[in-house]
Regions:
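General helical structural elements
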Residues: 6-7, 44
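Positively charged n-region of N-terminal signal peptides that target proteins for export
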Residues: 1-4
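Bacterial N-terminal signal peptides
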Residues: 8-19
Length: 180
């Protein structure tokens, strides 16, 4: 009985130590890159595949933009959003600031469809740059990433300034993109 207990304790301690060291390795990997570190490896460029119709909405989806109006949105002062809505999309208007949903969210599955301007103007972060903020803290980057070199943690679909996307699957400027 004592021998079994000792073996059990040794195995348990070994498993806990292995889990601790593994977590430290992941933490060290994240900490070895500075924010916007130009030497951080870029994710591979992949073909996004053919554009097609969007998949059906999940039964419990909350649609925040119907293509018709900004009724689910307000500006930073909790006033009606003043972005432009036309042809089924919304577009930021210079000087109107950011917008946010009226409804608050915690855990969610985010689906974003977006397009950058078809006329290429600027480079790096100055080219079709926007983002989706989660909980006023984390930004999921929206950026023209097609043939546009920038730092890894600032690419389209990155958690801006923190973690790069796994791949760069950006389409050409002006084409609709999406990510989940």
């Amino acid at each position: 009985m004592k021998k079994t207990l000792v073996v059990f304790c040794v195995i348990s301690i070994t498993a806990l130590l292995a889990a601790f060291l593994s977590a430290q390795d992941r933490k060290a990997d994240l900490q070895k890159w500075a924010v916007h570190d130009e030497s951080r490896p870029l994710p591979p460029v992949v073909d996004p595949g053919p554009a097609g119709p969007p998949a059906p909405l999940p039964a419990d989806a909350i649609v925040l933009f119907s293509g018709k109006d900004l009724s689910a949105w307000v500006n930073g002062k909790n006033e009606p959003a003043k972005w432009k809505v036309e042809n089924g999309y919304m577009e930021a208007v210079k000087g109107t600031g950011s917008i946010q949903t009226k409804q608050g969210f915690g855990d969610c599955q985010l689906h974003v469809e977006w397009a950058t301007p078809s006329e290429v103007v600027g480079t790096s972060q100055g080219r079709g740059n926007s983002g989706v903020f989660l909980m006023n803290t984390y930004e999921v980057q929206v950026l023209d990433g097609y043939d546009n070199k920038t730092y890894a943690d600032g690419m389209a679909a990155s958690i801006y300034g923190q973690y790069p996307p796994l791949v760069n699957a950006c389409r050409k400027p002006g084409e609709w993109q999406m990510y989940d």
